[in-house]
Amino acid sequence: MAPSNLPPVFNATSQDIEMLLAAQCHLGSKNLQVHMEPYLWKTRPDGINVINIGKTWEKIVLAARIIAAVDNPADICVISARPYGQRAVLKFAAHTGAVAIAGRFTPGNFTNYITRSFKEPRLIIVTDPRTDHQAIKEASYVNIPVIALCDTDSPTEFVDVAIPTNNKGRHAIGLIWWMLAREVLRLRGTLASRETEWDVVVDLYFYRDPEAEENKEIEEAKVPGAEEVGAAAIESGLVGDSWEAQAAPAFAGAGVPAGAAPGWEAEGGVDWAASSAAPADTWAGESGNPDAGVKW
């Protein structure tokens, strides 16, 4: 990491650098946009562009200082059309007082004053300049400064402050928003000092898959050991190690000795064919005298 140009009080700690590396904030894409070249550290043999983490931290601090300079937190609008950043912007807005737009950005939010969702923010922060291009385009029409999380292949047109980071991973996006919120609270004085740990864990900013959470709740609600014994056995109460011991009393009550095992062979040498050989009426014999014994 290159030496930082920040005052010593703003220098990143070793824990901050470890978190940025663990969340893979330094891994960019294989494409490189010309304006993102100053933030490039090197290119790996497989073509992945590695971002300079020192530049990322400097831009986080710069963006936090810009956000803290806005008097009214409600004049800041945070936007994320990318699903991985929607939970992060909602948490950022809850902790800093900003206004969040999570999901689709309605065209005309910043330019069409007739719409109900019309807003006039003094600053907007977007998760991805490519997916949030509509918000950046409208901000350029009304002279709103833009802070954006930019990958190595992100377009930087109309972006005033670009935070170089991986903006496609759920952990990278959540961590950058968490660090940005923490720096804003430190500059506002909400956190007593820079040595004070923030009691909000970074996991709250991570994207969570609704289907995965639902499946997890279903797994936790299952009866322990239900898969081994079966659902029908749990309902009938026949749960145990020996099925023969539980089935013996039922056969004993039906006239079968308790120790005898039930079988399909007939007892006592019964011949089923002999019992079925009883004389049967023949229609041929009756057809010789059809009127015999018939009274109408």
Swiss-Prot record:
Keyword rRNA-binding tagged: no
Region feature Disordered, mapped onto this chain: 274-296
One GO cellular component term noted in the UniProt record for this chain: cytosolic small ribosomal subunit
DNA-binding in keyword set: no
Biased composition (Low complexity): 274-284
Alphabetical UniProt keywords: Cytoplasm, Ribonucleoprotein, Ribosomal protein
PROSITE patterns linked: RIBOSOMAL_S2_2
Superkingdom: Eukaryota
Listed Pfam families: 40S_SA_C, Ribosomal_S2
UniProt GO MF annotations: structural constituent of ribosome
CDD domains (alphabetical): RPS2 (cd01425)
GO biological process terms held by the UniProt record: ribosomal small subunit assembly; translation
Subcellular location: Cytoplasm
Gene3D superfamilies, A to Z: Glucose-6-phosphate isomerase like protein, domain 1
Function: Required for the assembly and/or stability of the 40S ribosomal subunit. Required for the processing of the 20S rRNA-precursor to mature 18S rRNA in a late step of the maturation of 40S ribosomal subunits.
PANTHER family hit by this protein: 40S RIBOSOMAL PROTEIN SA (PTHR11489)
NCBIfam families: uS2_euk_arch (TIGR01012)
Family affiliation: Belongs to the universal ribosomal protein uS2 family.
Assembly mode: Component of the small ribosomal subunit. Mature ribosomes consist of a small (40S) and a large (60S) subunit. The 40S subunit contains about 33 different proteins and 1 molecule of RNA (18S). The 60S subunit contains about 49 different proteins and 3 molecules of RNA (25S, 5.8S and 5S). Interacts with RPS21.
Name by which UniProt lists this protein: Small ribosomal subunit protein uS2
Organism whose genome encodes this protein: Ajellomyces capsulatus (strain G186AR / H82 / ATCC MYA-2454 / RMSCC 2432) (Darling's disease fungus)
The gene coding this protein: RPS0
